[in-house]
Each structure stands twice: as C-alpha cells, then as structure tokens.
C-alpha cells in the first residue's frame, strides 16, 4: 500500500479558466475521455444527437449551454489522481470561479486562437497571479482559422506580462490543421478523427525531416513548419521549471478540444509538470500536505444537486493528511465535533461514496445547514485557514414572492442559495423596507436565482431593480447608518450583520469616502 506521502504526491488538482465560449467545457469533457472517465464525449454543439456535457449538469445549464456552477470531477491517469475543477466561464459567475481557484494548485488558461486574450481571461489570470499558482496555456480551436501563432505569443506577453514556452507547435490551422510538432520529443503528431471528436483521435508520429511528411502536408506547409521550429529554437524562451513554478513562464500548448487534436499530449505533459498539493497558510503557520493530521476547508456549497431529495452538499478541499469515511472532525468556526459519515466524490452530479481521500482531493459531505464557505475542518490541533472573500456586487434588486403561502419555501430558498454563494443578500437599515435586497456580480445571476427558486423551491419571485452599482463594507466607530439614508446611497447590513453601503456609482462612492476619513471602506468581506 502506498504511503501517505506517495498518495499525496500523485494528486493533481487544477482549475480551467477562460473567457466564455473558449471551449472550456469541451476541453474538460475531452480530458475525461482520455482519462477513461467517460467513453463518449457529448459537448459537441449543434449536432442533433449531441448529449449534454458531463460537467454542465444543472437544468438551466443544459437549457442555455453555459456553465453557471463549478463542477468537480476526478479520474486516474498515468499513475496520477486528477481532480478537475471546471469553473463557470460566464463573467456573471466569476465569484464562484474566484472561490474555486482557492482550491486549485494550478490552472489551465484556455485561449481561443481566433480571439486571443479576452477580458474575463485577464481577470481570472490576475487571481491566479495573486495566489501564485502555476499556469498552463492551451490555445484552442486550431481547427478554425485564427491569429498567427507568433502574434498570439506576443499578445499573451503584452496583455498578461507573462512569457510562454511552446511545448508543441501547430502544423497548419483551420482546414490545413494536421497536427502538432512536439518540441520535447522532436517529432510530428499527425491526427485523424472521423467521428466529430466523440472518441480519441488516432495519432501517427514521424520525424520533421521525414521526406514522406511533405507528401502529407504539402511542400509549402512542411517548409513553413521547419522554418518556424528553427525560429522558436533560436528566439523562444527555453523551458525553465523554476520560472514556471514562480508563475513567470507558462508552458504553451496548441490544439483543438473539439476534434481532440493535441489533448492527450497536453494531458501527459500537464501531469508531468503540474505541482502536487501545496502547503496552505493557517494563521501564522503553513500547514504541510504531508502532515498526518487531517485538515480541509469548504470552498463551495451546492443545494439541490439531487432535487428529488432536496440535499445540500458542502465541497471541501483536503489540505493535509488522510480522510476516512465516518471520521470525527473539529468544526473550527462552531467549536464542535461533527462526523463526516457520507463523504462523496463526483463526476458532475453523479456521485459515489468515498472510503478515503488525501490532501489535494475534493470531497463533498452532506450539509444539514452547519457549513459556510471558508469553514475549516480538522483533527488534532485546531487550525483556521484564511477565509474566502465575498466581492462587491454590481447589480441590486429587492426580492419578494407572489404567493403568501410560500413564505417558508421562500426563506429556505433564499437562505440556501445565499449560503452556497449563488447570490448575496442584504437588509435595509431604514424602517419600512422589509424585503431582502439581492446583490449580484452580473445580471445573469438574477435570472438563475429566479429559475432555481421556481424549479427547486416552487416559489415565483419578483425582482425590483435598484439604482446602485457599487457596494462597500464599512468599518469604524463613528459609523451611523441613518446618516446615509438618501437617494444616492443606501445603508444596509449583510447576512452576518456587517454594515454595508450601496452607491449609485463610483463617483458617489469616492465622494462619500473622501468625506468620511474616519471610516474604512472595503471592496471585499472576509468570510466569517
């Protein structure tokens, strides 16, 4: 049996980040295909027989064809245990993605070859930078016409301030995309796939100097490939593992997730280069993954993964030690012991009971209403990992329900969806305004909230938009909410009773901040 250290060192836990429609869910499906977790990929849009993507499991996701929650998937490949966190690409759900990146040891940045570095990619890249996690880059959709590969490399450096080292190089693009040249192995991988990417691509390998290659590629494409390889060898950044681990250099891969071209070689290089679980700060000390004592933190709560049972699952990232089914752990925030008797691991909504898990793994446990995002669980010496912040919403609305008989269902739905981080809720301090106020990073969150209240809790809700765009958490002894009862701002409290001010715009917010030097205004709130 493998030792604790051996089990932990073979874990690879990563998140995929991208702008919407860069192909993130498709890439996730194809990694699962190559990992043997699924036999037939189903994320091929536009095909009548296409199955719903494995990672897009919520009803609204299937209807809209977008990911709005984080899916957690695990498979074993090449001696490694791989945990994929497939995050929402839509900008309205970036807060869920921020939380998920707290649970990842590395990230795969997916870029559309035709569109280059897009706004949401920039935001998520910056979060990875702040966390100091290594970043892999996968340029996708080479089966379509896109930007020149050298121009894309320059764009990544100019926009993100990060150099790249191509581990492979595309052979053609669009209709002439034939495969990739593996710079480490020195051979060309030619792809053949006749079933729309539903099964693994067939691969033939040959040397770049093979005379037969000209017959396959055509003389012009073959000559251009040789010239580009020579240019890369002279002018490109050499591979440097230390620079990669510091986040200064990103290994760059080219391919097409839709057709599976380049996916397997990317997966194999990823497992070779990606870091095993890293230590995490708890107060004034680092908790090492190989410490024998179990510790974990909750980064996501998902209600109604099985609507028939109205269940709620708390997802936790194991930071150290070994987890065993049925073990008693300390719930640090509540200061009490809890038993984790039904731990589960997931393939999107499909689940199985897990008997044991190790640092780096993601497990889900039944939540009877005692967990919050950011909670720490541990055995032995109590530790408390840093909380996961809430971000300032940019859209606000009062929420009320149509049917007075649904009051209990409304309160339950609002509480559960707030606790899982799907929406933020505030309460006006001014008398006469009893209805809760919802805060969202983007408009689509309101739509998802209404959809889930209707379908999961049986409540029709009405949203009345409010004219505010900025929220700031306020601290300071001199703060008096009634001073801010006006038309340009609103004094509210969040669900933990903390003081918050809502502002019409950035200008109003800056003016109030300048006029109140004795108060502290924060754009984020640390989880309690």
Swiss-Prot record:
Residues 9-280 form the tr-type G domain. GO terms for molecular function: GTP binding; GTPase activity; translation release factor activity, codon nonspecific; translation release factor activity, codon specific. GO terms for biological process: regulation of translational termination. It is found in: Cytoplasm. SUPFAM superfamilies: EF-G C-terminal domain-like (SSF54980), P-loop containing nucleoside triphosphate hydrolases (SSF52540), Translation proteins (SSF50447). It comes from the Bacteria. Gene3D superfamilies: P-loop containing nucleotide triphosphate hydrolases, Peptide chain release factor 3, domain III, Translation factors. Keywords: Cytoplasm, GTP-binding, Nucleotide-binding, Protein biosynthesis. The keyword Nucleotide-binding applies. Its main location: cytoplasm. GTP binds at residues 18-25, 86-90, 140-143. CDD domains: RF3, RF3_II, RF3_III. GO terms for cellular component: cytosol. Increases the formation of ribosomal termination complexes and stimulates activities of RF-1 and RF-2. It binds guanine nucleotides and has strong preference for UGA stop codons. It may interact directly with the ribosome. The stimulation of RF-1 and RF-2 is significantly reduced by GTP and GDP, but not by GMP. Belongs to the TRAFAC class translation factor GTPase superfamily. Classic translation factor GTPase family. PrfC subfamily. This is Peptide chain release factor 3. It comes from Symbiobacterium thermophilum (strain DSM 24528 / JCM 14929 / IAM 14863 / T). The lineage of its organism: Bacteria, Bacillati, Bacillota, Clostridia, Eubacteriales. The gene is prfC.
